[in-house]
Regions:
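Short amphipathic alpha-helix that is part of the acyltransferase structural core
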Residues: 1-16
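A short helix-loop-beta-strand connector motif used in the catalytic cores of GNAT acetyltransferases and
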Residues: 22-34, 61
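Active-site beta-strand termini and strand-to-loop segments that position acidic
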Residues: 36-38, 121-122
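Conserved beta-strand in the GNAT
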Residues: 34, 40-49, 66
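Conserved active-site alpha-helix within GNAT-family acetyltransferase domains
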Residues: 78, 90, 94-96, 100-123
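Conserved acetyl-CoA binding element of GNAT-fold acetyltransferases
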Residues: 56-69, 117-120
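Conserved acetyl-CoA pyrophosphate-binding loop and the N-cap/start of the following alpha-helix
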Residues: 71, 75-83
Length: 123
């Protein structure tokens, strides 16, 4: 399960994953995108948006983004990020934020800037 590759502190439980997946699909504030190649899921992005006073509007948050290690640097991550940007623009979101300890250069290459301990891109 690709989500297990993301988790470093917790083991992803299949039953919780299944229940969460169904709930996320029903949530109007959740965004889930999947990247595939030749019928194989090679990446996913899970994000949300919400209202925030500091932004004078909606803020999107990339909660999880993962691309299979053997499929990195082929454009899947960029496409996943572009997809949440498009979704966010359609919802009049003001910015997208995420926190990461890895891949800072990747996010910078997409136009995100370091802000405190997270990256953001004004939309």
């Amino acid at each position: 399960m690709l989500a297990q590759s993301f988790a470093s502190s917790f083991a992803v439980e299949r039953s919780f994953f299944s229940a969460s997946f169904d709930a996320l699909l029903q949530s109007p504030d959740a965004y889930l995108a999947v990247a595939s190649r030749n019928g194989r899921v090679i990446g996913y992005l899970l994000g949300f948006d919400h209202r925030a006073f500091f932004a004078n509007g909606r803020v999107a948050w990339v909660e999880e983004i993962m691309v299979a290690e053997d499929m990195r640097r082929l454009g899947a991550g960029s496409l996943l990020m572009a997809s949440i940007e498009e979704w966010s623009r359609g919802r009049q979101t003001k910015l997208i934020a995420l926190a990461t300890r890895r891949a800072a250069d990747f996010y910078r290459s997409l136009g995100y800037e370091e802000s405190a301990t997270y990256f953001r891109r004004l939309l």
